């Protein structure tokens, strides 16, 4: 009886294997590279970073209490996180093919919708906290 072959998805990456401080250092470097790439290549990410540069100090200077300020800051940072995911989805789809395809469009539209919801969340959180 033949030995079952592992599924390609189960294969371990040849890039794995670093542990301890080396792994942490490499992960940090890759994260910074991702932030640089997003800032360099994604207009929406740059706009949202500059929005955060304005809103984060505004949250700290607001009359809201500590919890309110924390929620305001978290809502702004959530936009950055969601935009990073959206940009990663778009890059992966473009890597597969630049051809128009309904599933590619669907994935990109869904990612964009996630960013929109995160932005609406900022407006809602800020309105609720500042009106309290």
Where are these regions (language model features)?
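Membrane-interface alpha-helices at helix entry/exit sites of multi-pass transporters
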Residues: 103-109
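Alpha-helical membrane segments and immediately flanking helix-loop junctions
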Residues: 92
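Hydrophobic alpha-helical transmembrane segments
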Residues: 1-88, 96, 100, 114-132
């Amino acid at each position: 009886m033949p030995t079952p072959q592992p599924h390609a998805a189960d294969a371990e990456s040849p890039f794995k294997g670093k542990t301890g401080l080396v792994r942490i250092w490499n992960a940090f470097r890759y994260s910074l590279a991702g932030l640089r790439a997003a800032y360099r290549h994604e207009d929406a990410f740059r706009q949202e970073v500059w929005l955060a540069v304005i809103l984060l100090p505004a949250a700290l200077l607001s009359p809201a209490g500590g919890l309110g300020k924390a929620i305001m800051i978290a809502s702004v940072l959530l936009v950055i996180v969601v935009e990073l995911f959206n940009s990663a989805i778009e890059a992966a789809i473009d890597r597969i093919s630049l051809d128009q395809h309904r599933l590619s469009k669907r994935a990109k539209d869904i990612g964009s919708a996630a960013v929109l919801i995160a932005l609406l969340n900022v407006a809602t959180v800020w309105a609720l906290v500042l009106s309290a």
